[in-house]
């Protein structure tokens, strides 16, 4: 019984780490792209363009760190679902026609 409980908690921690790494990678990339777009739009100097990319990347990593620390500090075991993508309840046109 104890081995299944430790295995369950280990898989829960692994799921949290997977969700946090996925969230961090996505926010890093999207924020860096946003910084690159803003840098191209507003700045002429390459130094300020790189600075805006770095600023965007820092915002992405910082927000991911905040969310991940909130997930790991939560007492419930369902906290990994906080990072999961929201499930859509909409039905497609073909599904609606079948019903």
Swiss-Prot record:
Localization: Mitochondrion inner membrane
Pfam families: DUF543 (PF04418)
Keywords: Membrane, Mitochondrion, Mitochondrion inner membrane, Transmembrane, Transmembrane helix
Residues spanning the membrane: 27-43, 50-66
Source organism, top-level taxon: Eukaryota
Membrane topology field: Multi-pass membrane protein
Record's GO cellular component terms: inner mitochondrial membrane protein complex; MICOS complex
Similarity comment text for this entry: Belongs to the MICOS complex subunit Mic10 family.
Subunit text: Component of the mitochondrial contact site and cristae organizing system (MICOS) complex. The MICOS complex associates with mitochondrial outer membrane proteins. Present in a large lipid-enriched complex called mitochondrial transmembrane lipoprotein (MTL) complex made of proteins located in the two mitochondrial membranes, including the TOM complex and the core components of the MICOS complex and containing at least digalactosyldiacylglycerol (DGDG).
Its biological purpose: Component of the MICOS complex, a large protein complex of the mitochondrial inner membrane that plays crucial roles in the maintenance of crista junctions, inner membrane architecture, and formation of contact sites to the outer membrane.
Protein name as it appears in the record: MICOS complex subunit MIC10
Provenance organism: Arabidopsis thaliana
